[in-house]
């Protein structure tokens, strides 16, 4: 059994089926190039017959990338295969991915057919695709609900017809991990000629088991996995590329390797999230904002002593600069002391006790406490010499008029004021702030999130800015979203000022 696992990325095909996440051709090329840098083996670039846009995207992606196999999806229909081959004409390495439903539900209700007719159509499609390309992948749609004996007959028939990869999708996300393992194992043991083809997994996440099923399939003998960045995909999504890659990296004893450059995982995740306008849930494994963040006092104390106490991965392995100690109401004194130390503040124990009491009150109000907040608690006399703090903010806005903002900042004890107008209160406030902070900062990401449902409750703003070629993240929380936005921007400023 080969120890090489091939990564088939379907972000640009299955992943793009998420409502509202469609990309244009230029954006798809950006993602394809990032996937090439990431090290995926196969890029499923689209379903060419489905639309002129998909057809054109497959053509342009084929031109743009060099070494990955470019794959085009079809049904078991000759016209589909003709169009797919035409779209792949510029690809250095071509694959046609054809197939048909094999479960009784699909055979009876979708195709109004019989098991024998489905096998005939499967063989015919495989042979037809083989006339155009050497590399043909065949998918048995809804294989998860197809009985193993019949599935083995289909797989054996298409391998004899020339299929080089056989895809066993859990299309509905129904399988249990042990069932999927047994299904793959059954094919390995009962299909004549199975060693002439690679078995591929393609698992959906309807019951939250996509990654578990995919991993079980690998353990059963599959040597290609079909995955997406951030686990995006139709309905509840697909298996996450980053999760499979890091499972195998962390469990080296399995002896299964991929070609993935894991340090590219996080940047690729951010790119896909941004282009598709689909935020990654904060607690998403590997790439979520909180994946390497620790807020529990017990956990924080352990991580500060030795990261291996609560971290099984180095954040740098996935392209994140460092882990994050997130200060919340559950944080202990050790975490607060650490954040003060990082910001150059050393306090005697009795002073730390007083600040910790204030910190707990603030944390109950803000949920997450920033470095700027910690410095404010420590007092102006102990704050970083470059710390920027918001003194006041006044905004006038209304329908049919431009918003006007006046802002006051305290920078190292000096007071500064400015005013500006803008398209909306946040724009006006940020423009006023920029009149004081004369830095060429580019806003890269701006996210507003309500912490709870009430109109008078806190809103959170997460912001990413680029300054002098580096990215900085800021956070603000306030019952007023404009103030929260300004606090997030100031948080970014304070972070890059520490490096000046």
Task: Show which residues each predicted segment covers.
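Short, small-residue-enriched loops and turns at beta-alpha junctions
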Residues: 14, 18-19, 47-52, 103-105, ...
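Short beta-alpha connecting loops at secondary-structure transitions
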Residues: 67, 169-171, 226-234, 249-258, ...
């Amino acid at each position: 059994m080969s120890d090489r696992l091939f990564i088939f990325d379907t972000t640009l095909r299955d992943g793009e089926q998420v409502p509202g996440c469609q990309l244009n051709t230029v954006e798809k090329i950006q993602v394809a190039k990032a996937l090439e840098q990431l090290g995926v083996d196969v890029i499923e670039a689209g379903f060419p017959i489905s639309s002129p846009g998909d057809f054109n995207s497959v053509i342009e992606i084929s031109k743009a990338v060099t070494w990955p196999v470019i794959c085009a999806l079809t049904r078991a229909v000759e016209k589909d295969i003709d169009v797919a081959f035409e779209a792949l004409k510029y690809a250095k390495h071509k694959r046609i991915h054809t197939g048909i439903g094999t479960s009784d539900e699909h055979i009876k209700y979708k195709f109004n057919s019989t098991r024998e007719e489905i096998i005939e159509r499967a063989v015919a499609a495989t042979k037809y695709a083989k006339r155009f390309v050497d590399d043909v992948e065949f998918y048995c749609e809804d294989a998860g609900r197809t009985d193993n004996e019949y599935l083995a007959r289909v797989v054996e028939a298409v391998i004899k017809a020339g299929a080089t990869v056989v895809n066993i999708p859990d299309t509905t996300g129904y399988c249990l991990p042990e069932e999927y393992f047994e299904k793959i194992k059954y094919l390995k043991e009962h299909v004549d000629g199975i060693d002439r083809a690679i078995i591929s997994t393609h698992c959906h996440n309807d019951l939250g088991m996509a990654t578990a099923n995919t991993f079980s399939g690998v353990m059963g003998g599959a040597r290609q996995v079909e995955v997406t960045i951030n686990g995006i995909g139709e309905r509840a999504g697909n298996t996450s590329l980053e999760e499979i890659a890091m499972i195998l990296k962390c469990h080296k004893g399995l002896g299964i390797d991929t070609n993935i450059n894991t340090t590219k995982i996080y940047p690729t995740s951010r790119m896909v999230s941004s282009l598709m306008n689909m935020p990654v849930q904060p607690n998403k494994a590997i790439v979520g904002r909180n994946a390497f963040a620790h807020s529990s006092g017990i956990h924080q104390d352990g991580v500060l002593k030795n990261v291996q106490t609560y971290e099984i991965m180095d954040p740098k392995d996935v392209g994140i600069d460092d882990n994050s100690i997130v200060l919340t109401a559950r944080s202990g004194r050790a975490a607060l002391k650490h954040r003060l130390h990082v910001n150059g503040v050393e306090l005697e124990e009795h002073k730390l006790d007083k600040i910790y009491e204030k910190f707990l009150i603030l944390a109950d109000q803000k949920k997450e406490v920033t470095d700027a907040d910690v410095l404010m608690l420590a007092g102006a006399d102990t704050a970083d010499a470059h710390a920027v703090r918001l003194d006041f903010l006044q905004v006038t806005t209304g329908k049919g008029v431009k918003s006007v903002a006046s802002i006051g900042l305290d920078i190292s004890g000096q007071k500064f004021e400015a005013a500006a107008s803008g398209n909306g209160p946040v724009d006006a406030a940020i423009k006023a702030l920029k009149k004081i902070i004369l830095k060429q900062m580019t806003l890269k990401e701006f996210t507003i999130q309500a912490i709870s449902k009430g109109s008078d409750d806190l809103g959170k703003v997460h912001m990413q800015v680029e300054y002098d070629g580096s990215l900085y993240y800021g956070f603000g929380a306030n019952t007023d979203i404009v103030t929260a936005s300004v606090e997030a921007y100031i948080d970014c400023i304070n972070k890059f000022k520490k490096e000046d």
